């Protein structure tokens, strides 16, 4: 927006005026103001992205209500941008997790991978057809996939999820991502924001990545991942990439991203006003860009400090100590 651009230009002017190395106090103020602007900018843009993705999923819901594709639940903003920080000032990627529920006549069975590890990375989602004979008799909106002849099903009903987005009996990440990407391309014109943004679907085998450009040539990068919830927990089997060289398309690694974003939102309500925990995270994340050190490891360390350090110790005067 114009306001964002004006604030950014004002900050740049202050930075150029404050380059006297003897004036450390002014530089500290400029840095603090810069980080505060970045955090506020992330919050406002995150809200824009959430609204846009919500409208997109609403179109999906309307057009796929009678299908046998996965049921898409409201997206959950995850990752650094929705936690209030980012290792990058430009080209921030706004990540969202779209929970999947089984369509009618299907159930999901989560087969967790190797036990005993901190994060299970080789889990699968088995798709099983369930009997809907009672529904067929009472509602009459579908034929039972289990007890009707294949020929009748082929003639009178769309294919089951097993025949569209699965490999064998398992939900396929890459087929799901490609299906979603193709649907976004065809459904975008119906989304209200299509009048304000030019949309491009970027290559991705395990998610849906969008590049949105407005009339001012400002760009938003959005990545939608998919996940199936483990019971009532905040742990999901997700489509996110792993560090492995090769990840089978039927592999859905565990993700704690939803639990982590909830942790940061909870802490935001507990810490003192003007807490510096996000400023510390933002500063170190920027410093570590290009070093090969994992920003996820850095975030984990800050999360540990937030639970082990008295919350009163995150005030502005504690900034250098916390660093």
Which residues fall in each region the model found?
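N-terminal regions immediately upstream of nucleotidyltransferase
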Residues: 1-94, 98-170
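Catalytic cores of NTP-dependent nucleotidyl/adenyl transfer enzymes across multiple folds
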Residues: 85-86, 120-323
